[in-house]
Amino acid sequence: MSSPFPADTPSSNRPSNSSPPPSSIGAGFGSSSGLDSQIGSRLHFPSSSQPHVSNSQTGPFVNDSTQFSSQRLQTDGSATNDMEGNEPARSFKSRALNHVKKVDDVTGEKVREAFEQFLEDFSVQSTDTGEVEKVYRAQIEFMKIYDLNTIYIDYQHLSMRENGALAMAISEQYYRFLPFLQKGLRRVVRKYAPELLNTSDSLKRSEGDEGQADEDEQQDDDMNGSSLPRDSGSSAAPGNGTSAMATRSITTSTSPEQTERVFQISFFNLPTVHRIRDIRSEKIGSLLSISGTVTRTSEVRPELYKASFTCDMCRAIVDNVEQSFKYTEPTFCPNPSCENRAFWTLNVTRSRFLDWQKVRIQENANEIPTGSMPRTLDVILRGDSVERAKPGDRCKFTGVEIVVPDVTQLGLPGVKPSSTLDTRGISKTTEGLNSGVTGLRSLGVRDLTYKISFLACHVISIGSNIGASSPDANSNNRETELQMAANLQANNVYQDNERDQEVFLNSLSSDEINELKEMVKDEHIYDKLVRSIAPAVFGHEAVKKGILLQMLGGVHKSTVEGIKLRGDINICVVGDPSTSKSQFLKYVVGFAPRSVYTSGKASSAAGLTAAVVRDEEGGDYTIEAGALMLADNGICCIDEFDKMDISDQVAIHEAMEQQTISIAKAGIHATLNARTSILAAANPVGGRYNRKLSLRGNLNMTAPIMSRFDLFFVILDDCNEKIDTELASHIVDLHMKRDEAIEPPFSAEQLRRYIKYARTFKPILTKEARSYLVEKYKELRKDDAQGFSRSSYRITVRQLESMIRLSEAIARANCVDEITPSFIAEAYDLLRQSIIRVDVDDVEMDEEFDNIESQSHAASGNNDDNDDGTGSGVITSEPPADIEEGQSEATARPGTSEKKKTTVTYDKYVSMMNMIVRKIAEVDREGAEELTAVDIVDWYLLQKENDLGSLAEYWEERRLAFKVIKRLVKDRILMEIHGTRHNLRDLENEENENNKTVYVIHPNCEVLDQLEPQDSS
């Protein structure tokens, strides 16, 4: 006898024009007037997420079982009478009472037909060829070539059809019509690209299903062959026979939906982008776009999309069980003779899985109200949308707002959050009398363990479109965005800030390209770009140059060993209060893409780099991005950098130089990218900059972190009548005229497009530029050879790399591919101005250094006697009378026994040191007799003869020269030798050894290494 059971699975037997059973998540929205009367007939999935739990609710398969039961009751009355006394028969009759007629969603079918017509007929005229192209049919061919699953639909294209009725219907009730849209897409694909429907494992799965069916049939024959009678009229075991036939029929059936490809529809270019704070329950189920910054991403996991279960009691297979955002089993077995409601086994081979990823986004920094905490929202990505958003990306998501159970609250111990009656005012004596039955206290209590999530169908980074036109500019740009999205999916790459010039130019309109060409041809483009940076800030041209070069950046390189050399430029602005330091930071945050603003005092090491946190639902450890990761390929602005703790400053050492963040916590060992530029603002110690202290003395920063900054700008609040007048006029005009008071050469949009285009260049050094770069580095290095002055800034190899990065950025500003010596000269001036501009202390020398002069006079006097009055002692024998009287009066006073200090400027001290060291080195190279202090001073005064206007200046300069020589000996630049080297070799001349003191270069002195090349040149 033929089996009365349907050959297909119950869920696949649904009529083609019927609406699929909505889940409990979407059952409360999207109801049109035609469906409001049928709300009571809707089917629900079980509310429990636990498998193997008995549930009394009706399931999606009750329609098929009741249809079969009614047919059996009408056609086989004898069998019904025999089953009346059995328990399965009573259950069988109870199912027949729940007969519910399926509802045809007429509106959904109309939407499907309109969507199919839209995919087939919509066309756009191409600007290149002038021909009319059918956009979405061409995209289906593109999907077939690259084996893709997602089709991208422009919402503006939908609004052009049927006076926007189709777009409005999809926007308002997106969750309701999504199954119909997917069905319409499958019909169009089956018509124009049928080979795209089958996946690579369709044939394998079909063969596996046939083998599984044969195995199950043989197993049923072995179990029931000996006990079941062959007579069809026998009623000895009707239940077993029915179970066997149902098993064979259901097991061998394979639904077409079970093997077809799962297509996804991605809508983009919606007219309105909502903020996370604007998400409300009234928008549940509607299509909308939201914007936010990605802070955390989970790993990509498989999600059970359409499940296939096997009944553990009768071995019946149930396919296409929709999962309502949780593990959902069938409510009961479709076999009417089987009483199974809890025991199911998942068939992994027959089930369909999709890629799944959860992304947590946070409100953008410019959208957070003052004094409010930033809101967060979980976004669910499926299919081809996974791995599109990275931590730190400012993305725009298009999808539907859904409500899901808050699993984290359900699993917590203790009292569950719920709405209860406030009984604090009721007397305790009457509480027991009026309480009634205690079991009714929870009647009608509503659980509060739900939260709002966002199911996204499209995601795109907002930062990658900087410089492109607005979404509703013209259809050509929207088509370019659609093609870029398709290419992005095909290549499986994510566009960064250094994409190819051709791709960037294709995203611009013809007017924008012509405007960009005019800017490139301008001879004074560099100066105009500088004046366009922060136009509201008066002056500070050097700081504006540094910020412009920071946004342009250098070229990222990597060595043969794989070591990466950073191209980002780090800048620190130091200065007095009210010198526009924070205003520069605020401008960069609002102008540059992927920029993050933070304060050093309120930031920790984990908040700046990354933190390891535990996932609330899965319990796994995940990495939550910090400020540096959020600013990847951008700029991280850190205000009050000097207020940051030293331990927190150490945490960003690696990020500033290697541009990576290494984490070894909670079993996670990872190296994350932090390719960001740092723009820091710091106040000096004590509030105002102290000119008598060094740069390091004015800052609460360590030497390693100072060397990682490419540029230091010291802004001082000096009193200047002209500058103060211009500054006051600028501020007053800014308050009076607002934007009219500012006239930058280029607007913000023009500047963004130019910087975006300039970053596509990768300039290289020429041979002339290489030689010039080496010479300029030697000039920077020579003043800091030994670090003899505590006020000097240590010039290291990092400053050489800074000059290279600055030169590359200047070349990018001019849109050229080669670095010329003029670019290096500009970088050298900027680096020297930013670092060497710091005022240094005067060099102090004690009065005890005068003793060297008297000793030198005595030694020179003895030499004059031996040399018959020839030598330099003649000049120093008789000082002027007024100077001698002054010295005698000073020695007669009792208070003059204390040491007096003479100060000389640092520049003059360095100049005198260079002259003296060069002279002694020259004498040493020629092999002449060593010089005494008097010889050195006389030679120095001879060189300074034209600069001395009076005799008093002569004696003052002479006394200062002796003190400088003594200071050079103390600093171990010179070394005293008692007696000449020739006399030292002669051990018999012991008298001359004590009578003459000469000076030579100290063996450990490194100043000479910097001076000799200059002499040779």
Curated annotation (Swiss-Prot):
GO biological process, one term: pre-replicative complex assembly involved in nuclear cell cycle DNA replication
Positions bearing Phosphothreonine: T766
Domain MCM: 525-732
Record bears the keyword Transmembrane: no
SUPFAM superfamilies: Nucleic acid-binding proteins, P-loop containing nucleoside triphosphate hydrolases
Pfam families: MCM, MCM6_C, MCM_lid, MCM_N, MCM_OB
Biased composition, class Low complexity, residue ranges: 24-34
Residues found modified as Phosphoserine: S78, S249, S372
InterPro entries on file: MCM (IPR031327), MCM6 (IPR008049), Mcm6_C (IPR041024), MCM_CS (IPR018525), MCM_dom (IPR001208), MCM_lid (IPR041562), MCM_N (IPR027925), MCM_OB (IPR033762)
Binding residue positions for ATP: G575, D576, P577, S578, T579, S580, K581, S582
Molecular function per GO: ATP binding; ATP hydrolysis activity; DNA replication origin binding; single-stranded DNA binding; single-stranded DNA helicase activity
Enzyme class: hydrolase
One GO cellular component term noted in the UniProt record for this chain: nuclear replication fork
UniProt motif (Arginine finger) ranges: 707-710
Enzyme Commission designation: 3.6.4.12
Reactions catalysed according to its record: ATP + H2O = ADP + phosphate + H(+)
Homology family: Belongs to the MCM family.
Protein purpose: Acts as a component of the MCM2-7 complex (MCM complex) which is the putative replicative helicase essential for 'once per cell cycle' DNA replication initiation and elongation in eukaryotic cells. The active ATPase sites in the MCM2-7 ring are formed through the interaction surfaces of two neighboring subunits such that a critical structure of a conserved arginine finger motif is provided in trans relative to the ATP-binding site of the Walker A box of the adjacent subunit. The six ATPase active sites, however, are likely to contribute differentially to the complex helicase activity.
Complex formation: Component of the MCM2-7 complex. The complex forms a toroidal hexameric ring with the proposed subunit order MCM2-MCM6-MCM4-MCM7-MCM3-MCM5; loaded onto DNA, forms a head-head double hexamer. Interacts with MCM10.
Name by which UniProt lists this protein: DNA replication licensing factor MCM6
Organism: Saccharomyces cerevisiae (strain ATCC 204508 / S288c) (Baker's yeast)
